[in-house]
């Protein structure tokens, strides 16, 4: 019990210190999106602690978790070379005590992303699993881990992407509907003239 209290309070102080250490210009411009602003509830923080410290299976995704970790608002330029380093730390995108090897941020509304779950299946980038592809072009950033040091100082290279997002989805019993699970890729449109029909299939114009 004592060990849990010490760990909990230490992590809380650590997260508060991170927010204080953010550059002042970032605090002014993007403060409303911070992962643990004052408006967050105690339940949000406890939920984060359970997931971060857990040694068991990863918790199933939720709508709020997807919105918090994947979706971003306009503000910081998507082409900024430090985009991933800033957003990964700000949104606490880690896997337990490790840096994630890759991650995607999408500039879109959750409802639009959720609709993608009901689009036609297409091959994922690994050619094995089935993915759903968006019907519209989406802007986003692909983050690739280049240096893994002690948390939270994970270093990433940022790549701006504009294309069709590939996602996997999972069924959530509580709300009886499909919700986004993982972002598989952002596929840039081909150079030749093309379009997507209503089924999400590429139709090549002559």
UniProtKB/Swiss-Prot annotation:
Q: Which cysteines are joined by disulfide bonds?
A: 99-154, 117-169, 124-131
Tell me the leader sequence span: 1-26
Q: Which domain of life is it from?
A: Eukaryota
Tell me which Pfam families the record gives. Answer: RnaseA
Q: What Gene3D superfamilies does UniProt report for this protein, alphabetically? A: Ribonuclease A-like domain (3.10.130.10)
In alphabetical order, the GO MF annotations are:
nucleic acid binding
Q: Where, subcellularly, is it found?
A: Secreted
Q: Which family does it belong to?
A: Belongs to the pancreatic ribonuclease family.
Its recorded name reads Inactive ribonuclease-like protein 9
Q: What is the lineage of its organism?
A: Eukaryota, Metazoa, Chordata, Craniata, Vertebrata
Gene giving rise to this polypeptide: RNASE9
């Amino acid at each position: 019990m004592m060990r849990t209290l010490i760990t909990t309070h230490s992590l809380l102080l650590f997260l508060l210190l991170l927010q204080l250490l953010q550059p002042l210009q970032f605090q002014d411009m993007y403060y409303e999106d911070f992962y643990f602003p004052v408006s967050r509830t105690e339940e949000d923080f406890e939920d984060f602690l359970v997931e971060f410290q857990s040694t068991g299976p990863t918790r199933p995704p939720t709508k709020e978790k997807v919105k918090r970790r994947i979706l971003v608002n306009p503000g910081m330029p998507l082409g900024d070379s430090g985009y991933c380093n800033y957003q990964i730390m700000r949104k606490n995108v880690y896997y337990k005590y490790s840096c994630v090897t890759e991650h995607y941020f999408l500039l879109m509304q959750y409802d639009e992303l959720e609709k993608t779950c009901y689009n036609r299946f297409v091959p994922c980038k690994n050619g094995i699993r089935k993915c759903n592809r968006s019907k519209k072009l989406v802007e986003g950033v692909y983050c690739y881990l280049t240096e893994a040091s002690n948390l939270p100082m994970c270093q990433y290279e940022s790549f701006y992407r504009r294309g069709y997002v590939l996602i996997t989805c999972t069924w959530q019993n509580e709300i009886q509907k499909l919700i986004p699970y993982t972002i598989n890729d952002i596929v840039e449109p081909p150079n030749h003239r093309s379009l997507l029909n209503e089924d999400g299939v590429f139709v090549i114009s002559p």
